[in-house]
A protein has these predicted regions:
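Long, charged alpha-helical interface segments
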Residues: 2, 7-92
Length: 92
C-alpha cells in the first residue's frame, strides 16, 4: 500500500491519517470551487483549485485537538477532486 487514490464529488468528507503518508488534492475537473481544508498542515478556506495549478500537493493530515484518530476535513461546492495519499520516502 504505497498510494491510496480516491475520487470525490462536491460535498464534505473526512480523510483519515495514515502514518508516514502525505496528502495531495488535485482537481479532476477543470476546477474545484469553494474548497475548504481543515485539520491539515496547510489549510485553506473557500479556495478555487484548478487542474492547471497544483496548489493542493504534498499536504499532511494533522487532525484536531482531542482526536483519537487524526483526520482532515475537506469540503467543496463544485467539481470533482482526487485525493492521493502517498507513502513518504525517508530512505535515500
Amino acid at each position: 500500500d504505497r498510494e491510496i487514490i480516491r475520487l470525490y464529488r462536491a460535498g464534505s468528507y473526512r480523510i483519515y491519517d495514515r502514518e508516514g503518508f502525505s496528502l495531495s488534492l488535485v482537481a479532476y475537473t477543470d476546477k474545484v470551487e469553494g474548497l475548504t481544508i481543515k485539520g491539515a498542515k496547510y489549510e485553506v478556506e473557500d479556495c478555487l483549485l484548478t487542474n492547471a495549478f497544483p496548489l493542493g500537493i504534498s499536504n499532511v493530515v494533522k487532525g484536531f485537538d482531542g482526536q483519537d484518530r487524526k483526520y482532515a476535513e475537506i469540503s467543496f461546492k463544485s467539481g470533482y477532486l482526487l485525493s492521493v495519499q502517498s507513502k513518504m520516502v525517508t530512505d535515500f
